[in-house]
């Protein structure tokens, strides 16, 4: 969050709006600090701030995040590094089920560990979508830009 503070939060949000950015993930922006000091600025410039939750996040904190969110909630699938597995563990699936049962108002999107058809299908079973980061970059690096459509369809279809 420090680079945004140095730039100026309002100037940053204004610039984001001008160039077509409508959502941000700022992992080190504390939720209470955001709510008290910056939510109105983000709203003024129509910028969504996406908060992250993880398996260790308490139900109380998740409910707080849900109450102030207006974009989506980024469900981090595990505490491990991103792009590290080919399937979700039973513990991860229990976490997804726990969050689903909370009936949150804010859509959830699952990321970290989504990179093939199996993990994509599991993610969208419990959320509104999936974020495919590391696997996408790895495919791009190994197979080039012409492989992107094939990669996406191998997951989606």
Task: Show where each model-derived region lies.
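Short, well-ordered coil/turn segments that N-cap beta-strands
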Residues: 20-22, 45-49, 70-71, 104-108, ...
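Conserved, mostly hydrophobic/aromatic
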Residues: 16, 65, 123, 133, ...
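Expand to "…catalyze enediolate/carbanion chemistry for C-C bond making/breaking, isomerization
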Residues: 77, 101-103, 115-121, 141-143, ...
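Active-site-adjacent beta->alpha loops and helix N-cap segments on the catalytic face
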Residues: 4-11, 27-44, 58-63, 82-97, ...
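Catalytic cores of alpha/beta
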Residues: 57-68, 102-103, 110, 114-130
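Short beta-strand/loop segments at the ligand-binding rim of alpha/beta enzyme cores
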Residues: 1, 42-52, 100-113
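Catalytic beta/alpha-barrel core
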Residues: 20-34, 48-57, 76
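Non-cysteine beta-strand/loop elements that form the S-adenosyl-L-methionine
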Residues: 26-27, 70-78, 132
């Amino acid at each position: 969050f420090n680079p945004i503070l140095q730039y100026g939060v309002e100037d940053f949000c204004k610039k984001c709006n001008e160039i077509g950015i409508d959502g941000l993930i700022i992992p080190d922006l504390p939720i209470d600090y955001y709510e008290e000091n910056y939510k109105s600025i983000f709203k003024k410039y129509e910028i969504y701030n996406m908060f992250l939750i993880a398996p260790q996040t308490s139900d109380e904190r998740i409910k707080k995040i849900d109450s102030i969110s207006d974009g989506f909630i980024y469900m981090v699938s595990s505490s491990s590094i991103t792009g590290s597995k080919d399937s979700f563990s039973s513990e991860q699936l229990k976490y997804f089920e726990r969050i689903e049962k909370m009936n949150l108002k804010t859509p959830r999107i699952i990321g970290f560990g989504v990179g093939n058809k199996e993990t994509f299908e599991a993610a969208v079973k419990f959320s509104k979508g999936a974020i495919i980061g590391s696997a996408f970059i790895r495919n791009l690096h190994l197979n080039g830009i012409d492989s992107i459509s094939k990669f996406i369809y191998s997951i989606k279809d």
